[in-house]
UniProtKB/Swiss-Prot annotation:
It comes from Saccharolobus solfataricus (strain ATCC 35092 / DSM 1617 / JCM 11322 / P2) (Sulfolobus solfataricus). Zn(2+) binds at residues 231, 282, 410. InterPro entries: aa-tRNA-synt_IIb, aa-tRNA-synth_II, aa-tRNA-synth_II/BPL/LPL, Anticodon-bd, Anticodon-bd_dom_sf, Thr-tRNA-ligase_IIa, Thr/Ala-tRNA-synth_IIc_edit, ThrRS_anticodon. Keywords: Aminoacyl-tRNA synthetase, ATP-binding, Cytoplasm, Ligase, Metal-binding, Nucleotide-binding, Protein biosynthesis, RNA-binding, tRNA-binding, Zinc. The gene is thrS-cat. Its cofactor is Zn(2+). GO terms for cellular component: cytoplasm. The keyword Transmembrane does not apply. This is Threonine--tRNA ligase catalytic subunit. It is found in: Cytoplasm. GO terms for biological process: threonyl-tRNA aminoacylation. Homodimer. Probably interacts with its editing subunit (AC Q980D1); a subunit fusion (in the order edit-catalytic) is fully functional. Belongs to the class-II aminoacyl-tRNA synthetase family. Residues 139-433 are annotated as: Catalytic. Catalyzes the attachment of threonine to tRNA(Thr) in a two-step reaction: L-threonine is first activated by ATP to form Thr-AMP and then transferred to the acceptor end of tRNA(Thr). Also activates L-serine and transfers it to tRNA(Thr); unlike most archaea the editing function is found in a freestanding protein (ACQ980D1). In vitro when both subunits are present, or if the 2 subunits are fused, L-seryl-tRNA(Thr) is no longer produced, the 2 subunits edit incorrectly charged L-seryl-tRNA(Thr). Has no activity on correctly acylated L-seryl-tRNA(Ser) or L-threonyl-tRNA(Thr).
Amino acid sequence: MESYKPVWLKGAVILAINLIDKGYKPVAVGLGERDFYIDVKSDTSITLDEVKKAINENVLANVSIENNQIVYKGNKVSIIEDKVSISTNLNPKYFEILNISTHHPNPNEQYVRIRGVAFETEEQLKDYLSWLEKAEETDHRLIGEKLDLFSFHEEAGSGLVLFHPKGQTIRNELIAFMREINDSMGYQEVYTSHVFKTDIWKISGHYTLYRDKLIVFNMEGDEYGVKPMNCPAHILIYKSKPRTYRDLPIRFSEFGHVYRWEKKGELYGLLRVRGFVQDDGHIFLREDQLREEIKMLISKTVEVWHKFGFKDDDIKPYLSTRPDESIGSDELWEKATNALISALQESGLKFGIKEKEGAFYGPKIDFEIRDSLGRWWQLSTIQVDFNLPERFKLEYIDKDGIKKRPVMVHRAIYGSIDRFVAILLEHFKGKLPTWLSSVQVRVLPITDEVNEYAEKVLNDMRKRRIRAEIDYAGETLSKRIKNAYDQGVPYILIVGKKEASEGTVTVRARGNIEVRNVKFEKFLELLITEIAQRDVEQTTVKALK
C-alpha cells in the first residue's frame, strides 16, 4: 500500500482544489492507512454527489506541490499534513469515495471528512477495491471487538487503546518471547519514565524534529514532554558512569511506552495510535564491532519472523543509504554502510537498496514482511547513529587511554507491539497460534453429569499454566462448538460419560479436525510441547491423528 500513497495524495490534492473552486473550504489533506482524507470546514453536510461533481482530472495540469504546499493559480495553500514525495508525473484519473462523515474539532466548528482513493488506471482501482473488500473481512478492529481484546473510547481520547484481559494476554506473550530473544543477544532490560524535562529532547533534536507530535506541558516553572522515543533516556543511563572499551558493546532493551500526537484523520485502530509500546533496543559499541553486531541483529530478526510462520520470500530487507542532508564524515558513513552491506550479504537474504533514504545520522536496514493478504508491512529496523553520541558527548576510554565516541545502534524487531498485534490478527484472520491465543483450550461437557470430570480436566490444564476455560451445557453441543471456533479457540475438548469413565477426551481442532478416545495425559503432554516451542501450526492434533 505504501507505493499507492503518493498517487492517493495527489488525487486528494486535485479533489481539494476542485472543492475550493466550488466554494468549499478544505482545511486539511492527508493519508490514512488505506486511503486519503480531506477535512472540509462546513456547517452543513456534503453529499456523495457533490463530491463526485468535484472530481475533475482536468485540473491536474494547473496543480503543483512545492515544499508540501499546493501551488494553484499562483496561490500557495498549506493544507497538506503528510510529507510524502509526490511526482509531477502522477496522473490519478480514477477515484472512489469510501466514506463521508462529520466531526467537531471544537464545539463551534464542524468538519466534513471525505475519505477515498485515487489511481492512474481503472484496473488498479478495481484490484484495490477487491482487495479492500477481502481486507475488511479480517479487519483487526472487528476481530478485536469480537474476541474481546481491546477497545477505544472517545471519553478516554482518540488513538488511546484500552487492552482487555484477553488482549493483554497476547501482548504479554509477545513481550515474553522478545525478552528471550533479547536475553540470547546479551541485552540488559531497563525501565525509564514516561515524562522528561524538554531539555533532553532539545539536546537530542526531537524537540525540533518532533515538535508537532510532542505532548508538552509546564509544571512549577519547568517544561516537560511525554516521551516520543526511548533513546535519550537510554543514553543517560550509558552516561551515568565511565565506560571503557572492555565494556562495549553495551545493549539496553526496554518495552517502552511512547506517545506521539498523530493527527486525528490518520488514526486507524491499532495500526496508528497515539500511545503504544516499542520493543526498543539500543547498542553502544566501537566501530570495529559494528559489522558483527549487525549480523547478529539480522539473524535474530529473521529467526523471529520465521517463528511466526513467515518464509524467506515473505521477508524483504532494504538498505537505506546516505541522504543529501546528513552529518558525519565520509569515512564514517562508508564504514557503516559497508558494515551493513557485508552483514546483509552474509545473511543470504536478497535485499533492496533505497538510495538516499537513510536517516540523517546514519544508514539503516528496514525489514518489510508480507502477510497472508499479500500486503507488505515495514516492521523491524536497524539504524546506525553517529548523531546522538555526538550531541550527548558520549565517551568511552579506548585501550590507548584516549576518550572516543561510541557508535550507537537503534533496533526494534516488532516495531510497535500494538501495531504488530493488529497485523497478526489480520494475518491469521483471528485464529492465532496456540501459544499466542488468549484462550488455548475450551472444555465442553456434554451433560451436567460429567461436570466434575470436565472441571478436573480444566484444573489439570490450568495447573500446567495452559489458558483453559469451560463452557457448561447451557446451549446445544453444536452451538458451543461453533462459538469456540468463532472465538478463535485452537482446541476444544469434548467430554461425556465414556470419556469420564476412561480418562479420555475427544479433541477438536481448527479445520474441523476431530480425534476421539485420546488419553487426556497424552493430549496434555503434546499441548505443553506445542506451546513451549511456540509452534505456528497445531502440532498436537497432527501427532494425535
